[in-house]
Amino acid sequence: MAIYGIGTDLAQVSRIAAVLERTGGRFAEKVLGPDELRVFHARRARSEARGIAFLATRFSAKEAFSKAIGLGMHWPMTWRALQTLNRPSGEPYVVASGELAAWLDARGITARVTVSDERDYAVTFVVAEAPDHVAAARSGAAS
């Protein structure tokens, strides 16, 4: 396995809060996958600030992932096709669905993700890995 790509994103939590307020909550429904949306609603019910911070980290994760795989937010990378969930230990991991999952599987691409938030910022770093020949082809290196 070799590095296929890296991506990072920094989201301003107050900006995410403003968009959420302006859209009456539709922004969360547009961006979050079903499992993420359940966690968002549960966290927001306990603490508005923690719910919005969660939304900001997940928005940031999708942006960083789209950069790591080199597609940006273009098909098959869609907002809801990628979810960042947490293991019981708290470790984040990504789960793709639909056409994005098929696209990643066809290339053997996997990813590692880390997310963090502090006051008004949420940051994500993603490392996408693929078999050596796939990563080499993307970088233009001879196989």
UniProtKB/Swiss-Prot annotation:
Subcellular location(s) per record: Cytoplasm
Bilayer-spanning residue ranges: none
GO biological process annotation, one example: fatty acid biosynthetic process
Pfam families reported for this sequence: ACPS
Keywords for this protein: Cytoplasm, Fatty acid biosynthesis, Fatty acid metabolism, Lipid biosynthesis, Lipid metabolism, Magnesium, Metal-binding, Transferase
Domain of life: Bacteria
Principal localisation: cytoplasm
Annotated Gene Ontology cellular component terms: cytoplasm
GO molecular function: holo-[acyl-carrier-protein] synthase activity; magnesium ion binding
Presence of keyword Transferase: yes
Catalytic activity: apo-[ACP] + CoA = holo-[ACP] + adenosine 3',5'-bisphosphate + H(+)
Cofactor(s) listed in the protein's UniProt record: Mg(2+)
Listed EC numbers: 2.7.8.7
Binding residues for Mg(2+): D9, E63
First-level EC class: transferase
Record's keyword annotation contains 4Fe-4S: no
Biological role: Transfers the 4'-phosphopantetheine moiety from coenzyme A to a Ser of acyl-carrier-protein.
Family recorded in the similarity comment: Belongs to the P-Pant transferase superfamily. AcpS family.
Protein's recorded name: Holo-[acyl-carrier-protein] synthase
Organism: Burkholderia pseudomallei (strain 1106a)
